Structures are given as structure tokens and as C-alpha cells.
Regions:
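Short, compositionally biased P/S/T/A/G/V-rich stretches that sit at domain boundaries
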Residues: 24-77
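Short beta-strand edge/turn micro-motifs at domain boundaries
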Residues: 31-35, 42-44, 59, 107-108, ...
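Short, aromatic-enriched amphipathic alpha-helices that serve as compact interaction elements
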Residues: 166-190
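Short solvent-exposed beta->alpha transition segments
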Residues: 185-233
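Structural signature of eukaryotic scaffold interfaces centered on beta-propeller domains
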Residues: 305-318, 359-373
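Short beta-strand elements that form the blades of beta-propeller/WD-repeat-like
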Residues: 312-326, 331, 371-383
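Beta-propeller fold detector
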Residues: 341-348, 396
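Single conserved hydrophobic/aromatic residue that forms the stacking wall/gate
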Residues: 384-395
Length: 396
């Protein structure tokens, strides 16, 4: 399955959290209004395979159509135990259970309540016993349920009992490749796997591929530091190849000493043989988290930093008000007043939380009118328990 199909299936699984209508006035005598979500509170579920953390799952407050919940696939080890860690923090979990179904959801294979688990410092640790009812190299659906009072949170992944698929070797290869891209002295071995040609754009770090130069793959002149450990997600497992994604955040120091943040995603399609690992495809995307520093404005241009050219934006008919979406945030710029406002953000103000800083939610701008009013929709995974769809706060 290629990367575009993977993303399409992810989008098919997201659901509408809330529709937010926001109006902000650009006159200095009127306060700007912004819509904020509460900080993320719903637990995340982390799965493990051979002591490697994989496939961090985010909860759905509604029951989804599991047929379309194909974002990740989780290998089951030979002991038929699936270790999980629930990062629940202050969110009370009254009961933990799971079910296993056929991929079309019609056949229920297991429906089990987990009685044996430990809970300490806001973390639940458990081993899910997977019944000896799975065929090797066949995919099934695993749905984990967390009961909280009258509410149930649902977490979805595919599972497989891999045979001769070499999943751990593929993960280790991807992690080693990733680390070597930051090692200028030890990166020469990566050239073995690259296929440079003229199809790659070697002028930007926003999109790097197997066809890029080794210089681009090793970050060219960018002097960044990895802020978060790469989050490993497995997208495909079979005898021919495995697909591994690594997500992480890097930081760098800007020209004026300000700290810059970048979301990075690496895509690996690899094949194992007895002789060596083959890299069938590699892609890396890099997107700067917009911070609205003074040097982001240059003449009549607004500089968004290193990012994809595919930016969601809309303006009013006269072009005096421009709204755009950047890495989970909605910004609006008044060209007449030369004022920039952050209208909405999934992120809180304290650091970068993986529940807020992921790509399974987004913002769509509906319209921008001449008065400076912008209508937009927020959609994707629900990371907070919402009793009211929106709330309003003042921005100075």
C-alpha cells in the first residue's frame, strides 16, 4: 500500500469534532476573539513489540466504523501477549477490555475484559492475551475499550501474527537510517540505499526522497536538534516488504536567536533478505511550526519557513484579509493594519504534546468576508472530552 493510500484511509477514519464559527474585528478599538479547546486530556495507548514502543493510538469518544480504521498494523509476538501502556494521567479508567474481529468486522473472535493490570503515576500497564485463534500473516481488527463512567473510549489498530516478515529488523533499519542522517561523519553508508536522479528537488528540505542527493538526506546546512524521540508507526506488514513511519520534532536556532520548531515525518518501505536490507522507498517531509516572529514579514511577503507549498488559505475579495492554516493552527493577517492574529490552535501553551501535535486532525477555512469575519471547521480526532463545542477567550 503506498503512502497516499495510507493517508486516504486515515482521512476516511477521522470524524467531525465540532464546527467552529469565529469572528474577529481588525479595528484596534475592538478586541480580537479566539476560540480555544481545552488541553488534551484523553488517554493515549502505546503498544509494544519486542520491547519496542510502536503505534501510539488516540481515542475516539464515539464508536467508529472499524472497517475503515486501518491506519496502523501491530505485530503479535510468539508468546501471544501484546504489551500496552495507557497514558491516562488524571483521567480515571474504570475498566479495560478489548475485542478482536475479522477485517470486515462480521466475525467476533474475542471479547475480553482485562482484570490484571497495574496502575502507577497516571500510567496503566497491561499484557493483552491474544487467543490462539489467529492465522499467521492474516490481518484482524483489534479494538481496545477504556470505560470511564458512562463513557467508552475506543482505540483501533490492525493486528497480525507475522511469520517470516522480519518486522523488528525493519524497524531497527529505519531507526538506524534516521540516526545516521544526523551523523555527518557516519552517513556515507546511506549512499548504498539512495537512488538520486533529476526528479528530486534538492533546493529545499521540505520534501526529501530516495531520489534526493545524500547531502539533502543528511540535512544539508540545517543545524537542528532532535527534540522528541521518533514515534514509530507500522503501516504495512507482509512477506515482501514492511512500511515504517517515524514522526518527531526538531528544533533549530533562528537568525535572531529565536527557537524554531519543525514537525518531521519519515516514510520507509523496506525489504529484508538474508544478505541485506533493501530500501524500496524513502520520503521525508519537514514543516515549520509558525511562530509569527518579526522576521517572518518581508516586504509584501509572509514567510512560512520550511514547509510544503500546499498550504490551506483563503482571503476576502479585496485581498485585505488573508487566513491560512499551518501545522494545526489558524492564522489571519490584516494587510491594511499589518496585524497578524492566531485564531485557533490545537496546541496548548506548555510544550508540545503528542496528542495535540499530530496530523489526525485539521482545520478547513470556509470563507473570509470583507468585515474580517472568518468561518472555519475543526475536524479530526477528539482529544478532549467536550461538553460544549466551543468556548471563547480574549486575545490581546
Amino acid at each position: 500500500m503506498n503512502k497516499g493510500m495510507i493517508r486516504a484511509l486515515v482521512l476516511a477514519g477521522v470524524f467531525l469534532v465540532s464546527t467552529v464559527v469565529f469572528s474577529f474585528l481588525t479595528n484596534k478599538t475592538n478586541p480580537d476573539m479566539t476560540t480555544e479547546l481545552e488541553e488534551a486530556t484523553l488517554p493515549t495507548v502505546q503498544l509494544y513489540y519486542k520491547e519496542q514502543k510502536i503505534n501510539e493510538l488516540y481515542g475516539y469518544v464515539d464508536e467508529m466504523n472499524a472497517v475503515y480504521m486501518r491506519d496502523s498494523i501491530t505485530p503479535i509476538d510468539t508468546d501471544r501477549l501484546l504489551p500496552i501502556r495507557v497514558q491516562n494521567g488524571s483521567y480515571a479508567v474504570d475498566e479495560l477490555s478489548y475485542e478482536i474481529r475479522s477485517m470486515d468486522t462480521k466475525r467476533l473472535i474475542a471479547d475480553t475484559k482485562v482484570d490484571s493490570y497495574s496502575q502507577k503515576n497516571g500510567v496503566i500497564t497491561a499484557d493483552l492475551p491474544i487467543q490462539n485463534l489467529l492465522d499467521s500473516n492474516a490481518e484482524y481488527l483489534l479494538i481496545i475499550h477504556l470505560l470511564h463512567g458512562d463513557d467508552t473510549l475506543n482505540y483501533y489498530t490492525r493486528i497480525i501474527e507475522p511469520q517470516d516478515c522480519y518486522v523488528k529488523e525493519s524497524i531497527d533499519f529505519a531507526k538506524d537510517f534516521h540516526e545516521k542522517t544526523f551523523q555527518k561523519d557516519g552517513s556515507g553508508s546511506l549512499a548504498t540505499y539512495m537512488e538520486p536522479d533529476s526528479s528530486a528537488d534538492n533546493t529545499t528540505l521540505a520534501n526529501v526522497s530516495i531520489h534526493s542527493t545524500l547531502r539533502q538526506v543528511t540535512w544539508d546546512k540545517f543545524n537542528g536538534t532532535v527534540l522528541t524521540d521518533p514515534s514509530v508507526s507500522i503501516k504495512e506488514i507482509n512477506n515482501s516488504y514492511n512500511v515504517i513511519l517515524l514522526d518527531y520534532v526538531v528544533t533549530a536556532t533562528g537568525d535572531n536567536g529565536e527557537l524554531e520548531y519543525y514537525n518531521v515525518e519519515e516514510y520507509y518501505r523496506v525489504r529484508y533478505t538474508n544478505d541485506r536490507m533493501y530500501l524500496l522507498n524513502f520520503e521525508r517531509t519537514m514543516d515549520e511550526i509558525f511562530r509569527a516572529e518579526n522576521d517572518d514579514f518581508y516586504e509584501n511577503y509572509l514567510q512560512l519557513g520550511i514547509c510544503s507549498s500546499d498550504v490551506e488559505y483563503k482571503s476576502n475579495e479585496t485581498g485585505s484579509i488573508l487566513c491560512f492554516v499551518k501545522e494545526g493552527e489558524l492564522w489571519c493577517y490584516n494587510a491594511t493594519e499589518k496585524k497578524l492574529s492566531q485564531v485557533f490552535s490545537f496546541r496548548g501553551y506548555e510544550g508540545i504534546d503528542s496528542r495535540e501535535n499530530h496530523k489526525e486532525h485539521d482545520i478547513r477555512i470556509i470563507k473570509v468576508d470583507e468585515t474580517g469575519s472568518a468561518d472555519f471547521v475543526v475536524y479530526g480526532l477528539s482529544l478532549i472530552h467536550i461538553s460544549e463545542p466551543t468556548r471563547h477567550a480574549q486575545i490581546s
